Amino acid sequence: MGMRMMFTVFLLVALATTVVSFTSDRASDRRNAAVKAFDLISSTVKKGCCSHPACSGNNPEYCRQGR
């Protein structure tokens, strides 16, 4: 293989590595955002439910978890 061909292969490998790394970072960012949103929603619902006697009476195991 000539020097030019080896350099071209190196550039293609570097580009492919960068693209794979970039897309996997974006996917993990989406997962983290989804987990944070779920935690926020569940804590809000838990506070709302557990502050009402009827709801907390129907879900005792759910309301005891956070307290």
Swiss-Prot record:
Question: What's one GO-annotated cellular component?
Answer: extracellular region
Keyword annotations of the record: Acetylcholine receptor inhibiting toxin, Amidation, Cleavage on pair of basic residues, Disulfide bond, Neurotoxin, Postsynaptic neurotoxin, Secreted, Signal, Toxin
Q: Pfam families under this entry?
A: Toxin_8 (PF07365)
* Residue numbers carrying Glutamine amide: 65
Q: Give the signal peptide, or none.
A: 1-21
Which cysteines in this chain are paired by disulphide bridges? 49-55, 50-63
Asked whether the UniProt record includes Oxidoreductase among its keywords, one would answer no
Q: Which residues form the propeptide?
A: 22-47
Instruction: List GO molecular-function terms, semicolon-separated.
Output: acetylcholine receptor inhibitor activity; toxin activity
Query: In which tissues is this gene expressed?
Result: Expressed by the venom duct.
Looking up InterPro entries in the UniProt record yields: Conotoxin_a-typ
In which compartments does the protein localize?
A: Secreted
Q: Which family does the record claim for this protein?
A: Belongs to the conotoxin A superfamily.
Domains (record comment): The cysteine framework is I (CC-C-C). Alpha4/7 pattern.
Any miscellaneous information on file? Both the globular (with C1-C3; C2-C4 disulfide pattern) and ribbon (C1-C4; C2-C3) isomers shows no or very weak inhibitory activity on muscle-type alpha-1-beta-1-delta-epsilon/CHRNA1-CHRNB1-CHRND-CHRNE nAChRs, alpha-4-beta-2/CHRNA4-CHRNB2, alpha-3-beta-4/CHRNA3-CHRNB4 (IC(50)=1928 nM by globular isomer), and alpha-7/CHRNA7 (IC(50)=1935 nM by globular isomer).
Q: What does this protein do?
A: Alpha-conotoxins act on postsynaptic membranes, they bind to the nicotinic acetylcholine receptors (nAChR) and thus inhibit them. Globular isomer (C1-C3; C2-C4) selectively inhibits neuronal (non-muscle) nAChR subtypes particularly human alpha-3-beta-2/CHRNA3-CHRNB2 (IC(50)=35.7 nM) and alpha-9-alpha-10/CHRNA9-CHRNA10 nAChRs (IC(50)=569 nM), while the ribbon isomer (C1-C4; C2-C3) shows weak inhibition on alpha-3-beta-2/CHRNA3-CHRNB2, but not on all other receptors tested.
Name of the protein in its database record: Alpha-conotoxin G1.5
Tell me the organism.
Answer: Conus geographus
